[in-house]
């Protein structure tokens, strides 16, 4: 979903369509200045800067369960976790190399967050979310090295098959 989607509507729609795509991923920045203004203008929090208190108990519990068992990933993009990111950034998903690399790994290879080098966390309420760990650069290098090895092995296999 777009980060500016209404949070409550997003949760309702996610409950209906979560089984159709491979995964649904939302990356949030709780200090996103554009989404602060959007919340004021639209009179409700946005998917990219959600306010869980807007949900009723059933929807809140569904989100906790979805984060643990379903094809839904919540990623926290905090400036404190992302070197050089402006804490109020709205363009971090394409402006920051860690986040844009994560987006590409998800879109091109359909990797789950752990496979992309992200770190699993849980809130006090049990909501599972993912963060960029301090050693993300090294984790990303390992992921990329694995992709290169896999591609090289596939190319070698293709070459053997074509010469037989």
Predicted ranges, named:
Residues 2-161:
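Lipolytic serine-hydrolase domain surface
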């Amino acid at each position: 979903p777009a980060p500016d989607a209404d949070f409550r509507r997003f949760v309702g729609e996610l409950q209906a369509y979560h089984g159709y795509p491979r995964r649904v991923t939302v990356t949030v920045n709780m200090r996103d200045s554009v989404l602060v203004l959007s919340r004021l203008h639209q009179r409700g929090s946005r998917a990219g800067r959600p306010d869980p208190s807007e949900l009723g108990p059933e929807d809140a519990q569904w989100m906790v369960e979805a984060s643990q068992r379903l094809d839904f990933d919540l990623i926290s993009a905090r400036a404190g976790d992302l070197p050089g990111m402006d804490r109020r950034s709205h363009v971090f998903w394409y402006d920051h190399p860690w986040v844009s690399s994560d987006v590409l790994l998800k879109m091109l290879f359909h990797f789950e967050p752990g496979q992309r080098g992200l770190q699993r966390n849980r809130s006090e309420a049990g909501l599972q979310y993912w963060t960029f760990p301090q050693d993300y650069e090294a984790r990303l290098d390992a992921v990329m090295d694995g992709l290169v090895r896999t591609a090289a092995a596939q190319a070698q296999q293709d070459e053997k098959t074509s010469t037989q």
